[in-house]
Amino acid sequence: LGQFFGKAVAMHVVVNGQAREFKYSPDLFEMPADSPAHDLPADTGFAGFRLQEWNGADDWRTQDWVAFLGASYFRAIGASGQYGLSARGVVINAAVPGVNEEFPDFTEFYIDEAQDPAQPVVVCAFLNGPSITGAFRFYLTRGLDRRQGVEMDVEAALFLREDIQRLGLMPLTSMFWYGEYG
């Protein structure tokens, strides 16, 4: 948690079909002695998570391949090994004159590790907001050929709590890298 990710999420690990909560502890992290993270309360919580893999270097650095951090945002790397598009679970009332856009949050995650590298990692997420609630199931396949990007299949069940003027499902967003004008 911090400047950009202000809400904690509940994390669960699924093993053999059984879920157990994975509690936050500062002992899970290695931090330099002068890190401001040492000043955080012991029950701070998780802001989200990233799935990583060893990148083959001797120093055991890792390569992110999927991230779920902040509101209902998620993203995965492409064939170049870099993040490109990001997505949100839903967008509510974007660009509706006189109405504030709503940003529902993923509040809980259940991560079911793949038993075989060719099988997907399954992530379930609960979505919660003032006007909507729901559940998502993500099938995340990294692929055995690391030159490929991540394949993501998504199932969702959404339930409206009140009328919504404009609802978008998994809208994509990205940053401009370079091109004819820059």
Residue ranges and their predicted role:
Residues L1-G98:
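Solvent-exposed N-terminal domain segments of exported/luminal and surface proteins
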Residues G6, T44, D116-P120, T133, ...:
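A general secondary-structure signal for short beta-strands and their flanking turns/coil
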Residues E21-K23, T133-A135, I164-R166:
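Short acidic, gly/pro-rich beta-turn/loop elements at beta-sheet edges
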Residues S35-P36, T107-E113, D163, Y178:
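Intrinsically disordered, low-complexity boundary segments flanking structured domains
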Residues R137-G182:
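Acidic (Asp/Glu-rich), glycine- and aromatic
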